[in-house]
């Protein structure tokens, strides 16, 4: 709201780290962990998870997906397993030095980060260009990462894509890709319930989690359509088999 009410032309810098989880450097990560955690047993446990995994998770620079290369070409000294609570914890710890530089050294007021997605707001477009170059150098020199081609500076009025939403001064909507992914997942949930592979509580909790996602944006028509289409039925043949 403050952007809309200010009457000024606002811009945003959207920074996205290239293949973040696949490119996290093990030495850099463990150095950060050792500075933050004093318990040696805990550090050894975390180091085992990071440095002694049963398989390699690192991608060479320029490779977009693990599907593009063989297991032998995956890198052992970078990358961590995605999923579970530890990967998100590692991700936040890894980029904390960047947060500290932004807030404490540079004093950037409108700095927002969720994992490797970063938004900075300003009325000064040239300042955002300076920030872009500064963070690009910091990521490369200190964290051994680089920004991808989604990194851009645009007017806020054009809409910012962030954490599954398109955010404008006057409204917030689900990104089209988020909406399509949600519809596909809910269709899968219906199929799993129909075939007795999940129970009612699981199906209902999935639907309600998406309702919470939609509650934060302007998509009442979409929400109404989702609830109308989400009908749970059991496969009659499966029911007959169970009764027999």
Feature annotation, model-predicted:
Residues 2-115, 119-134, 154, 230:
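Conserved polymerase palm-domain catalytic core
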Residues 24, 49, 139-142, 234:
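Prokaryotic Sec-type signal peptides and long signal-anchor helices
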Residues 37, 136-144:
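A common structural junction motif
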Residues 104-110, 143-147, 220:
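Surface-exposed helix-capping loop/turn segments at secondary-structure junctions
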Residues 32, 138-139, 159:
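Residues within well-ordered alpha helices
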Residues 67-77, 129-130, 147-244:
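Right-hand nucleic-acid polymerase module
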